[in-house]
């Protein structure tokens, strides 16, 4: 199975306008897997578009805390998605140990609901979970310590680096709890400006990939000043070593 995927949020405008064509273009680049967002609202478009283009979606992003979790997990199961990842919890919830514990408890509870649908739960970081420190440790690692083993992690290596962490070292500490990583590059600005295809920015991509050799590698752009499909194709070329 390929270890390469792409987050559909990267091409959210194109996907909203024409999901079928967007998935076709990503498949033409060479992707066989995608990471959707908003599985409930996009379930019909994804059901048709994935099948038509020979794509699968092993992971997806969807808000879980405070959401209609049975509906999310039912849609995920219908689409063959095995891991549903909560994409963010707001920065103010990462400053106090009690708030961090509450977030961990909420995802641990969500994992029990997900299991009824044969789906797993995960969490995806931004920079603020790493920037915030609790007794000298990154809030993200304090949080990870409190998760049930059934809850996976998707480490956004760009945001972790922007938050002040050595992403490769972080991956090493978290170990096989990391089931997926987001791979992007650029100047590490927290406002998402200056993002670049993999291998063209400041992130030590080779070290990051070596630190999580079995994790799904999900290409993502929060923003890009140019043609997003060309940028995604450049990342695909870099990550596959296809220099044709």
Predicted stretch roles:
Residues 33, 65-152, 173:
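Active-site acidic/histidine proton-transfer and metal-coordination neighborhood
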Residues 38-49, 93-95, 99:
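Active-site-adjacent beta->alpha loops and helix N-cap segments on the catalytic face
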């Amino acid at each position: 199975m390929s270890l390469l995927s792409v987050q559909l949020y990267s091409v959210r405008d194109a996907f909203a306008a024409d999901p079928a064509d967007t998935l076709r273009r990503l498949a033409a680049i060479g992707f066989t897997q995608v990471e959707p967002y908003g599985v409930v609202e996009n379930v019909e478009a994804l059901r048709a578009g994935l099948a038509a283009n020979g794509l699968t979606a092993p992971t997806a992003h969807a808000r879980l805390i405070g959401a209609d979790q049975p509906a999310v997990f039912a849609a995920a199961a219908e689409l063959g998605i095995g891991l549903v990842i909560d994409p963010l919890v707001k920065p103010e919830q990462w400053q106090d140990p009690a708030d961090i514990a509450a977030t961990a408890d909420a995802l641990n509870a969500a994992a029990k609901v997900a299991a009824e649908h044969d789906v797993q739960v995960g969490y995806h970081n931004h920079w603020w979970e790493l920037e915030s420190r609790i007794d000298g440790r990154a809030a993200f690692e304090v949080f990870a310590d409190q998760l049930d083993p059934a809850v996976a992690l998707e480490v956004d290596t760009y945001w972790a680096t922007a938050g002040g962490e050595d992403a490769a070292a972080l991956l090493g500490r978290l170990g096989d709890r990391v089931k997926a990583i987001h791979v992007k590059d650029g100047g590490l600005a927290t406002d998402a400006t200056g993002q670049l295809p993999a291998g063209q920015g400041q992130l030590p991509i080779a070290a990051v990939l070596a630190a999580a050799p079995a994790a799904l590698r999900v290409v993502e752009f929060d923003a890009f000043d140019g043609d997003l499909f060309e940028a995604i194709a450049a990342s695909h070329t870099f990550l596959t070593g296809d220099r044709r």
